[in-house]
UniProtKB/Swiss-Prot annotation:
Membrane topology, as annotated: Single-pass membrane protein
Classification via InterPro entries: ATP_synth_b/b'su_bac/chlpt
Origin superkingdom: Eukaryota
Record localization: Plastid, Chloroplast thylakoid membrane
Species: Brachypodium distachyon (Purple false brome)
The gene coding this protein: atpF
Subunit and interaction comment: F-type ATPases have 2 components, F(1) - the catalytic core - and F(0) - the membrane proton channel. F(1) has five subunits: alpha(3), beta(3), gamma(1), delta(1), epsilon(1). F(0) has four main subunits: a(1), b(1), b'(1) and c(10-14). The alpha and beta chains form an alternating ring which encloses part of the gamma chain. F(1) is attached to F(0) by a central stalk formed by the gamma and epsilon chains, while a peripheral stalk is formed by the delta, b and b' chains.
MF annotations from Gene Ontology: proton-transporting ATP synthase activity, rotational mechanism
Remarks, miscellaneous: In plastids the F-type ATPase is also known as CF(1)CF(0).
Name this polypeptide is given: ATP synthase subunit b, chloroplastic
CDD domains, per database record: ATP-synt_Fo_b (cd06503)
Cited PANTHER family: ATP SYNTHASE SUBUNIT B, CHLOROPLASTIC
Entry's transmembrane regions: 27-49
Length: 183
């Protein structure tokens, strides 16, 4: 890593009398300088982005595992409900003479309650996955935006010098002065 940095420093200070060298003026860069800068950014930035994406991947996988556990629990509840349904059906056969319609209503209520519970759990799982995905995408967008803003600020700060500041201030004073004369 240190050798790579020293080689770039060496190239930047190489005499430019008709030979190859790095142009450090960002506004007058050529294709080779841009290629070197982009290459360095890709080389050093891909590790950070890869780590960020790996962390998000692990969180999403964890959420999926949790959802799968919820699904398994739901299936266990469904199996218990089926066993209970079988029990209710057996009792229905025994009490058919005494209250067939009441038992049938209880059976339908049990099936409906189980179905509603399953739908709610499935909906909850899908919403959790959707929100985790959205949160992951928003965090990645925010990180990329922050890095872009930091890079832009760094570029602007490196391009601005004292003379440019004074020219800008003088131009703005001239504009304000002409506005005062118009009143």
């Amino acid at each position: 890593m240190k050798n790579v940095t020293h080689s770039f420093v060496f190239l930047a200070h190489w005499p430019s009398a008709g030979s190859f060298g790095l142009n450090t003026d960002i506004l007058a860069t050529n294709l080779i300088n841009l290629t070197v800068v982009v290459g360095v950014l890709i080389f050093f930035g891909k590790g950070v982005l890869k780590d960020l994406l790996d962390n998000r991947k692990q969180r999403i996988l964890s959420t999926i595992r949790n959802s799968e556990e919820l699904r398994r629990g739901t299936f266990e509840q469904l199996e218990k409900a089926r066993i209970r349904l079988q029990k209710v059906e057996l009792e229905a056969d025994e009490y058919r003479m005494n209250g067939y319609s009441e038992i049938e209503r209880e059976k339908e209520n049990l099936i409906n309650a189980t179905s509603i519970s399953l739908e709610q759990l499935e909906k909850s799982k899908n919403e959790t996955l959707y929100f985790e995905k959205q949160r992951a995408m928003n965090q990645v967008r925010q990180r990329v935006f922050q890095q872009a803003v930091q890079g832009a600020l760094g570029t602007l700060n490196s391009c601005l010098n004292t003379e440019l500041h004074f020219r800008t201030i003088r131009a703005n004073i001239g504009i304000l002065g002409s506005m005062e004369w118009k009143r």
